[in-house]
Amino acid sequence: MKLQFFSFITLFACLFTTAIFAKEDTAEDPEITHKVYFDINHGDKQIGRIVMGLYGLTTPQTVENFYQLTISRDPKMGYLNSIFHRVIPNFMIQGGDFTHRSGIGGKSIFGNTFKDENFDVKHDKPGRLSMANRGKNTNGSQFFITTVPCPWLDGKHVVFGEVLDGMDVVHYIENVKTDSRNMPVKEVIIVESGELETVPLDNKDAAKLQEEIKAEASEAAHDEL
């Protein structure tokens, strides 16, 4: 009788634990409000397109920064013709330094840097789009895309989107030949970038917040003139 009882308890515990992990594994990602893309060349070779979905309701300021830099045609203020300057296999690919093309530069649409918005979304799978930084509250324009789950980055870097299509391109970049600084020997270039789709915001508060963020960015740009 005791053996049956303990067997039942063990079975229940296993089922309970499985249910918890199953719930965690099936947790939904934040709503996607923008779809943008990068077309990538490795030297002169076209290697394809990366399509990214942005979490504009979860991280509206971070998304607005990335979105504006993606659609920009200003050669001094945008991702067009910038490079992926840091590539580490089984970790991530990093880009966004359009001022120095080395990892020491870049800037946001709100000025040089802006604060960490939140750490609600985790680096829990390949394809997470997250902000690179130099420490707390130092977000500029540099970003990275994970190629594996990176839980050690949680609470330190702001995740604001994910790769929807083109992980094959991400993995291609991940495996290009690099030098001792993890910089690709042959440049990996964003030869085209832009918007595929923006989802209208039904939530009035969210729409209002987005307009306020745009106004803040516009004011920051005006102050730099």
Curated annotation (Swiss-Prot):
Coiled coil: none annotated. Disulfide bonds: none annotated. PPIases accelerate the folding of proteins. It catalyzes the cis-trans isomerization of proline imidic peptide bonds in oligopeptides. GO terms for cellular component: cytoplasm; endoplasmic reticulum; endoplasmic reticulum lumen. It comes from Saccharomyces cerevisiae (strain ATCC 204508 / S288c) (Baker's yeast). A motif (Prevents secretion from ER) lies at residues 222-225. The keyword Phosphoprotein does not apply. This is Peptidyl-prolyl cis-trans isomerase D. Belongs to the cyclophilin-type PPIase family. PPIase B subfamily. It holds the Pfam family Pro_isomerase. It comes from the Eukaryota. It is an enzyme of class 5 (isomerase).
